[in-house]
């Protein structure tokens, strides 16, 4: 473990991860309060905790059982530091056990919405409520997810919250600044959760809200210059938000010492290559090496239908192409990557066996060892929304910074089954039409009246009102009629979702007129597609991408 440069320059909160699926949401809420924080595994050393010197500590939830598993505990240093501590779900239970309380099986497990009654006037919950009962008790609408519960509070703790099935749903030792809740304040389902976390971070822990992107640019530029000196840097430019912002930031710091390598694998969106080159060569005057490797990628993908196999082939071929180009740049000493904080967290989760792989990521993690280059990751402390904010501050156009996420393997995982050049071309055109209709259609008062959007969203484009939207190519044919003739062509599926964190997502309720126009245009303008369907699956159970 090592301290990041950002950790040394700001007040900070330490989040200890016990394996929850939503630990990243805790960090996002803290960052939204403009306070720097980092997530680290619960089994970090006492020395690391002391060196980190947090203003406060948050203990995450977990899929494990405190009642059964005596290994997942917070380091002793957490309790010796003398700083406020907030336990969430499992974090509450381990706080209870470690400080002398007891945890027991719950006869009634709680998963989903619940209403919690506040007790007393603790600093954490004072004045925070969703409604009051006729008797005047403050109530909170929260999200529960637990099978165990605290049966006996540790010495010094008082009851802070309860539900009928969980008599101790919150507890506090105000003298020591220890607070714990059985529910999850980090998820959006807990209505007052953001306010609760801000109360802990800003008021109780006393952290300064000085984590601001425009100031971060100056810090990052100075850090890059100090790291790199007069040496040269190479970066794989994909056109995605992360690599684009990383390139712009590094170019701001060292100018022509940076060379970007843009690999076209034949699976990009319509005109994506031109947009990237116009931006970085034309506007930023950065050095860009453009490699058309579409024949190589598509050749190796021929006959391959399995999604995992496709991802691995694309990742492998990217490494091969990038490596060949990098070797031509004999003066390069650094490899820059657009690694962001969720990547860092997920890598740590994999190492501690606390995370499950749903889909392989096609990153270039093996390149530094292969090429003998030092690694430069200027975005590794930032979440995606912070990366976008940084991109705007760096002067990148909004249409690039706020473009919807695009998978590393590109259209390769939006073409079901085998990838073929003609499939990719059909999909590119269908996708562009769908996105064009979303961008060109504004939400109306009628949409708001129908419940499709909020009144405050009237006048915004449906592209901005969706978190991710794209077309999928289905390698099946259906019968159609065009003019007086019979057609037998392929099917395109349209997918649009709305989400705050991409961990869960709802399918977007788009206006029928918009969907109708997109469908008609695709069928009429993309020869080879004669049917369009709309995906109405949420996440879970479906994933956002089809493969």
Swiss-Prot record:
CDD domains linked: GATase1_GMP_Synthase, GMP_synthase_C
Cysteines joined through disulfide linkages: none
E.C. designation(s): 6.3.5.2
GO terms of molecular function: ATP binding; GMP synthase activity
Reactions that this protein is recorded to catalyse: XMP + L-glutamine + ATP + H2O = GMP + L-glutamate + AMP + diphosphate + 2 H(+)
PROSITE patterns: GATASE_TYPE_1 (PS51273), GMPS_ATP_PPASE (PS51553)
Residue numbers binding ATP: 238-244
Family annotation (Gene3D superfamilies): 3.30.300.10, 3.40.50.880, HUPs
Pfam families: GATase, GMP_synt_C, NAD_synthase
Residues annotated as domain GMPS ATP-PPase: 211-403
Keyword annotations: ATP-binding, Glutamine amidotransferase, GMP biosynthesis, Ligase, Nucleotide-binding, Purine biosynthesis
Domain named Glutamine amidotransferase type-1: residues: 12-210
Pathway: Purine metabolism; GMP biosynthesis; GMP from XMP (L-Gln route): step 1/1
Active site residues according to the UniProt entry: 89, 184, 186
Any GO CC annotation of this UniProt entry: cytosol
InterPro entries: Class_I_gatase-like (IPR029062), GATASE (IPR017926), GMP_synth_C (IPR001674), GMP_synth_GATase (IPR004739), GMP_synthase (IPR022955), GMPS_ATP_PPase_dom (IPR025777), NAD/GMP_synthase (IPR022310), Rossmann-like_a/b/a_fold (IPR014729)
Subunit structure: Homodimer.
HAMAP family in UniProt: GMP_synthase
Chain's role: Catalyzes the synthesis of GMP from XMP.
Name of the protein described by the UniProt record: GMP synthase [glutamine-hydrolyzing]
Lineage: Bacteria, Pseudomonadati, Pseudomonadota, Betaproteobacteria, Burkholderiales
